[in-house]
Amino acid sequence: MALRSRFWGLFSVCRNPGCRFAALSTSSEPAAKPEVDPVENEAVAPEFTNRNPRNLELLSVARKERGWRTVFPSREFWHRLRVIRTQHHVEALVEHQNGKVVVSASTREWAIKKHLYSTRNVVACESIGRVLAQRCLEAGINFMVYQPTPWEAASDSMKRLQSAMTEGGVVLREPQRIYE
């Protein structure tokens, strides 16, 4: 009963002379005429408002903090990879220049933890690298800076995390800023 009333309602609407559907039309003229004048589209606005703040980063034009040469780790980045290793867990964060965490992965997460034998060893670091690389690509972050301390860079677990990130498609080096 409900289908019948809906059908007749649609049928009566389509029988109106003002209703133009391509499937029901037998004429060869287009169903709708464009209302916008194409000459009007060629005018360029004198001011440009950037509504996407990431656009400047992707074009390598955005500002980087350059006055922190004597500080370690350097503050000259748009996105930075931070790895935090505790007694029981490994956590990797992607931090934006303003200090906010954009993407993170940790062995505290149950979805990662249930696949690991240990939440601290080399395999855990490699798994965190794979998961974080996938999440970064899903978030649109392809480049980031990784500045490990010398003793972190020498460890096998950090080397495996770096290789998992690069194999996942993330470049651990940001492009140079264009100053012109």
Curated annotation (Swiss-Prot):
Source superkingdom: Eukaryota
Main location: mitochondrion
Presence of the UniProt keyword Protease in the record: no
Disulfide bonds: none
One Gene Ontology biological process: translation
GO cellular component: extracellular space; mitochondrial inner membrane; mitochondrial large ribosomal subunit; mitochondrial ribosome; mitochondrion
Keywords (A to Z) from UniProt: Chaperone, Mitochondrion, Ribonucleoprotein, Ribosomal protein, RNA-binding, Transit peptide, Transport
Compartment(s): Mitochondrion
GO molecular function: 5S rRNA binding; structural constituent of ribosome
Residues making up the signal peptide according to the UniProt record: none
Pfam families the UniProt entry points to: Ribosomal_L18p (PF00861)
The protein's assembly and partners: Component of the mitochondrial large ribosomal subunit (mt-LSU). Mature mammalian 55S mitochondrial ribosomes consist of a small (28S) and a large (39S) subunit. The 28S small subunit contains a 12S ribosomal RNA (12S mt-rRNA) and 30 different proteins. The 39S large subunit contains a 16S rRNA (16S mt-rRNA), a copy of mitochondrial valine transfer RNA (mt-tRNA(Val)), which plays an integral structural role, and 52 different proteins.
PANTHER family documented for this protein: 39S RIBOSOMAL PROTEIN L18, MITOCHONDRIAL, LARGE RIBOSOMAL SUBUNIT PROTEIN UL18M
Task performed by this protein: Together with thiosulfate sulfurtransferase (TST), acts as a mitochondrial import factor for the cytosolic 5S rRNA. The precursor form shows RNA chaperone activity; is able to fold the 5S rRNA into an import-competent conformation that is recognized by rhodanese (TST). Both the cytoplasmic and mitochondrial forms are able to bind to the helix IV-loop D in the gamma domain of the 5S rRNA.
Family (UniProt): Belongs to the universal ribosomal protein uL18 family.
Protein name, per record: Large ribosomal subunit protein uL18m
Gene (name only): MRPL18
